[in-house]
């Protein structure tokens, strides 16, 4: 049953027929006379499509005729959808007509209308209009199907609209704009109350829980969706935009998926009859005023992307074959637009990724270039500084020695006191040159990880007294007060670390402080303990250091650029070497200074893990841990080094055999079958001997110990993979050699 407010007539009619209906409305008002008025006109411009660049928009002629009588109201509307055709509707519903008058702001019509239609005594206006309508339709042969000329015109209009949709797809990459404009244009063309795009979303497959000890079965992925685009004939039509599906109600719709995937267009002329078995679905559609619908699929890459749905509200509608074909073609072209948009999005994504990679790669290249430039600058700075630091003592040595040589050929000899002065100067500069070279070598070994600590227990007070005594002469000569502030009790005086390295650290810091402090100044060495750490603090009353120069103070060959640098005559590596030695102990060094306020260097050294040992204790431990096979083969060309190793190991109760080189070494090892081999030589020869040892079944368990002057981490990694078990750097440290031999001999057989 039709709602009370539904139009009684809605058809596509030729423009000529619509004009005849308008004239009939006027004629009926004139013929009826008393109290009957007819208002005819165009709708205000606000009802026409807004101007814009869209190729889908066109001017719409929207006209009306309102017949007002005491007994009945009648509204005729016609909306031009093509040059020769109108979408026509007729209604007698009072509520619709009142809303129409109020919406169109027609005060003249409102004043002429009675508050309530009177009950007519004779034939009603509706009856007369119905009879006249049938007469006009029959005379024009319009009946319930369009005449051939109308069909041809509709087909031409469909082709034109399709061309416009295709043109916009080609012109625009904005999918939202394409879909919005297409929905609006198709809604107007089909003269439907609502046209929507229902877009599907697919959830991931899930597992159906089963009984215990059963394998869960995969559940097919579920599809759901929402209305993403919409066009309505008027605001009175409820919106469905953003409406999500209700799976229970739409189960019947989902059964059409296979049909939709084949491109079928589904037409439902009356939902109440078509879905009579589904009360839920009918109730849902009626909630949004849907009475008839036409559905076309949008298939993208073999998947049902969405549905293009036309809704006719309030009354049934018989869908024409041309309308079905047209909506199906629109769905196909929209699918093309979606594929085009997806491809464009993928291209944009690839483009953005490529641009990101280009930016990252450019940054990497820029960073690499800057690092190379910095390294080149540092190398140049290193060469300049080291050449200057080495050239200064060399110049003095060469100059003074040349002077002495010239005096040997001179008739008058150089006074002995002068000769002694020159020779002492040469000796002093030679020692300075040697110290600089040793510092550079030591720093290089520290940075490459080739330096090991020789930790032992010693007296901190004795160390402090030794360092102060060695620099006391320099302090007196420069008229500087050198003080020791020792804050450790006698019972806590012992400390475990590398005594030689600590002596070097303190000497370097004190020597710099003396050079940094002017006459009548003070330099203090302060020592105390905190927990398992020893703190060494060197404080002076010199000119201080600018805050900007502190970050580069511990970097090798960095030029600070002021008078502070001139005091450090250590080849540019003094403080850098000090910092490396401190960090080798696992400690750290800090500096506090400001111009004119002096400088404080604070060094923190943690107690090392090596226990205090004596020569007798080492011997006792070696005796206790001596393995059954105590024979050792030493392969060493240097007689002095070989003699030292043999004497150390012999005292430790090892049986030592000395081989000069690796020639026939494999045969000797197989014959003697030692527990340990200490080998020194070319890496190629050493690896060749080691390979033969590890391949031999009789001696494959023998431990191989390598001696080398220097060894990088990469070289050691390569050598260890070829069978070498451990290494020790030269010059040899006897205590460390015995500890390494003991640790290797205590390891379980491999």
UniProtKB/Swiss-Prot annotation:
One of its GO terms (molecular function) is phosphorelay sensor kinase activity. Residues 385-609 form the Histidine kinase domain. The modification 4-aspartylphosphate is found at residue 680. Residues 1-173 are annotated as: N-terminal domain. Signal peptide: none annotated. Its EC number is 2.7.13.3. Residues 631-745 form the Response regulatory domain. The modification Phosphohistidine is found at residue 388. Residues 174-333 are annotated as: GAF domain. GO terms for biological process: cell division; rhythmic process. It catalyses: ATP + protein L-histidine = ADP + protein N-phospho-L-histidine. Residues 604-750 are annotated as: PsR domain, bind KaiB(fs). Keywords: ATP-binding, Biological rhythms, Cell cycle, Cell division, Kinase, Nucleotide-binding, Phosphoprotein, Transferase, Two-component regulatory system. Pfam families: GAF (PF01590), HATPase_c (PF02518), HisKA (PF00512), Response_reg (PF00072). The N-terminal domain is followed by a GAF (phytochrome-like) domain that lacks the conserved Cys residue for ligand binding, a histidine kinase domain and a C-terminal response regulator domain (pseudo-receiver domain, PsR). PANTHER family: HYBRID SIGNAL TRANSDUCTION HISTIDINE KINASE C, TWO-COMPONENT HISTIDINE KINASE. In the N-terminal section; belongs to the phytochrome family. Functions in an input pathway to the Kai circadian clock. Senses oxidized quinones via its C-terminal pseudo-receiver domain, providing a link between cell metabolism and the clock. Affects the ratio of phosphorylated to unphosphorylated KaiC, binds quinones via its pseudo-receptor domain. Quinone-binding destabilizes the protein rapidly. Autophosphorylates, does not transfer the phosphate to its pseudo-receiver (PsR) domain. May play a role in cell division. Homodimer. Part of the circadian clock (KaiA, KaiB, KaiC, CikA, RpaA, SasA), the composition of which varies during the circadian cycle. KaiA and CikA compete for binding to KaiB(fs). Interacts with RpaA. This is Circadian input-output histidine kinase CikA. It comes from Synechocystis sp. (strain ATCC 27184 / PCC 6803 / Kazusa).
């Amino acid at each position: 049953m039709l709602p009370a407010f539904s139009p009684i007539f809605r058809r596509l009619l030729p423009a000529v027929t619509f004009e005849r209906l308008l004239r009939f409305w006027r004629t009926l008002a004139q013929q009826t006379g008393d109290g009957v008025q007819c208002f005819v006109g165009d709708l205000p411009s606000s009802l026409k499509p807004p101007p814009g660049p869209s190729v889908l928009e066109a001017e719409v002629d929207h006209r009306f005729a309102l017949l007002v009588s005491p007994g009945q109201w009648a509204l005729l509307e016609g909306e031009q959808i093509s040059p020769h055709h109108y979408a026509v509707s007729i209604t007698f519903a009072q509520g619709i007509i009142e809303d129409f008058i109020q919406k169109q702001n027609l005060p003249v019509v409102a004043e002429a209308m009675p508050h309530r239609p009177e009950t007519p005594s004779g034939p009603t206006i509706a009856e007369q209009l119905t009879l006249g309508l049938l007469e006009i339709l029959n005379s024009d042969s319009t009946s319930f199907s369009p005449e051939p000329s109308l069909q041809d015109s509709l087909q031409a209009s469909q082709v034109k609209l399709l061309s416009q949709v295709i043109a916009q797809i080609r012109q625009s990459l904005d999918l939202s704009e394409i879909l919005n404009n297409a929905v609006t244009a198709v809604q107007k063309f089909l003269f439907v109350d609502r046209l929507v795009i229902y877009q599907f979303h697919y959830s991931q497959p899930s597992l159906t829980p089963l009984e215990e000890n059963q394998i869960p079965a995969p559940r097919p992925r579920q599809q759901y969706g929402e209305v993403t685009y919409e066009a309505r004939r008027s605001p009175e039509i409820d919106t469905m935009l953003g409406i999500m599906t209700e799976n229970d109600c739409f189960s019947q719709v989902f059964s059409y998926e296979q049909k939709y995937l084949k491109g079928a267009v589904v037409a439902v002329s009356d939902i109440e009859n078509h879905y009579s078995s589904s009360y839920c679905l009918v109730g849902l559609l009626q909630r949004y005023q849907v009475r008839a619908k036409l559905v076309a699929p949008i298939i993208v890459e073999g998947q049902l992307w969405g549905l293009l749905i036309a809704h006719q509200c309030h009354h049934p509608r018989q869908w024409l074959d041309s309308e079905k074909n047209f909506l199906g073609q629109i769905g196909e072209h929209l699918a093309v637009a979606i594929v085009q948009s997806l491809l464009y999005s993928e291209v944009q994504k690839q483009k953005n990724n490529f641009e990101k990679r280009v930016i990252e790669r450019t940054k990497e290249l820029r960073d690499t270039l800057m690092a190379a430039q910095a390294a080149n600058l540092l190398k140049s700075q290193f060469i300049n500084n080291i050449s200057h630091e080495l050239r200064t003592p060399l110049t003095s040595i060469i100059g003074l020695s040349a002077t002495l040589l010239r005096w040997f050929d001179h008739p008058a000899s150089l006074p002995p006191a002068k000769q002694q002065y020159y020779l002492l100067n040469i000796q002093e500069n030679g020692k300075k040159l040697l110290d600089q070279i040793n510092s550079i070598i030591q720093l290089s070994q520290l940075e490459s990880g080739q330096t090991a600590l020789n930790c032992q227990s010693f007296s901190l007070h004795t160390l402090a007294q030794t360092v102060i005594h060695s620099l006391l002469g320099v302090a007196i000569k420069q008229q500087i007060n050198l003080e020791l502030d020792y804050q450790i009790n006698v019972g806590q005086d012992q400390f475990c670390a590398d005594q030689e390295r600590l002596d070097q650290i303190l000497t370097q810091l004190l020597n710099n402080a003396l050079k940094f402090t002017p006459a009548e100044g003070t330099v203090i060495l302060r020592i105390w303990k905190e927990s398992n750490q020893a703190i060494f603090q060197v404080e002076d009353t010199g000119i201080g250091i600018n805050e900007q120069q502190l970050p580069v103070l511990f970097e090798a060959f960095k030029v600070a650029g002021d008078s502070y640098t001139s005091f450090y005559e250590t080849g540019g590596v003094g403080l850098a070497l000090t910092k490396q030695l401190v960090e080798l102990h696992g400690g750290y060094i800090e500096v506090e200074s400001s111009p004119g306020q002096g400088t404080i260097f604070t060094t923190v050294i943690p107690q090392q893990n090596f226990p205090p040992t004596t020569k007798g204790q080492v011997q006792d431990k070696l005796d206790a841990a001596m393995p059954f096979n105590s024979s050792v083969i030493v392969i060493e060309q240097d007689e002095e080094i070989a003699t030292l190793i043999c004497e150390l190991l012999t005292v430790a109760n090892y049986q030592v055999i000395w081989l000069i080189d690796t020639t026939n070494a494999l045969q000797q090892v197989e014959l003697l079958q030692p527990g340990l081999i200490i080998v020194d030589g070319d890496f190629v020869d050493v690896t060749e001997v080691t390979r033969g040892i590890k391949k031999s079944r009789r001696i494959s368990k023998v431990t191989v110990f390598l001696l080398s002057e220097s060894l990088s981490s990469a070289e050691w990694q390569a050598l260890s993979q070829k069978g070498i078990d451990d290494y020790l750097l030269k010059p040899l440290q006897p205590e460390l050699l015995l500890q390494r031999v003991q640790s290797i001999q205590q390891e379980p057989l491999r």
